[in-house]
Design a protein with these regions (language model features):
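DUTPase catalytic domain/fold
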Residues: 1-158
Length: 158
C-alpha cells in the first residue's frame, strides 16, 4: 500500500482494515532461496538459520527457513499459538503484500494444536532466486471464533 501513487490505497477503508485486523511476524534476517523446479525441494542460499544470545550470554541457533516438501518453503516462527477453546488461528501471508515467485498456503490452526506453526509458501517460478529482507512481514495471523460457522446461513439469489 505504501507503494501506491500518493499512498492512495490507504484511502480505501476495507483495504486498510484488512491490513490492520491481525498481527504480522517479521523476518529476523535477510533470506534467499531457489527452487529448481519439478520434483525438487527448494535450496536455502542465505538466512537459513539465525544465532541468538540469551540474557545469560548463551548462544543458540534457530531455523528461519526450512525446505519442506517438493516446491515448498517453510518459514519458522519458533513457537506455538494456543487459543482458548472455540477459537482458532487463521494464518497466511500478509494481506496485499505479494512476494514474486511465491504463493502462500493459508491455514486454520485449532487452538489445541500442540506444535509450533510454520508459514508455508509454494514456489511458483523455477530457477528464480526469491529474496526477502530483514523486517519484512512473512506471516499474518488473526484469531477466529469457530462458533460462528455453525450459525452461518447463506441466502443465494440468482
Amino acid at each position: 500500500m505504501d507503494g501506491t501513487y500518493n499512498k492512495n490505497a490507504y484511502k480505501c477503508p476495507p483495504l486498510t482494515r484488512a491490513n490492520v485486523h491481525g498481527w504480522e511476524i517479521l523476518l529476523p534476517c535477510d533470506v534467499s532461496f531457489i527452487w529448481e523446479g519439478g520434483n525438487t525441494v527448494p535450496k536455502v542460499i542465505k538466512g537459513g538459520k539465525k544465532t541468538y544470545t540469551t540474557p545469560q550470554g548463551q548462544e543458540y541457533e534457530r531455523d528461519i527457513l526450512m525446505p519442506s516438501v517438493i516446491g515448498t518453503m517453510s518459514f519458522t516462527i519458533g513457537w506455538a499459538i494456543n487459543t482458548p477453546p472455540g477459537f482458532s488461528v487463521w494464518m497466511s501471508a500478509p494481506p496485499n503484500s505479494p512476494v514474486p515467485g511465491l504463493y502462500p498456503m493459508t491455514a486454520m490452526v485449532p487452538g489445541w494444536w500442540p506444535d509450533e506453526v510454520n508459514m508455508n509458501y509454494i514456489c511458483t517460478t523455477p530457477n528464480k532466486i526469491v529474496t526477502m529482507s530483514e523486517g519484512e512481514p512473512f506471516m499474518y495471523f488473526q484469531i477466529a471464533d469457530d462458533s460462528f460457522l455453525e450459525e452461518v446461513e447463506f441466502d443465494v439469489v440468482n
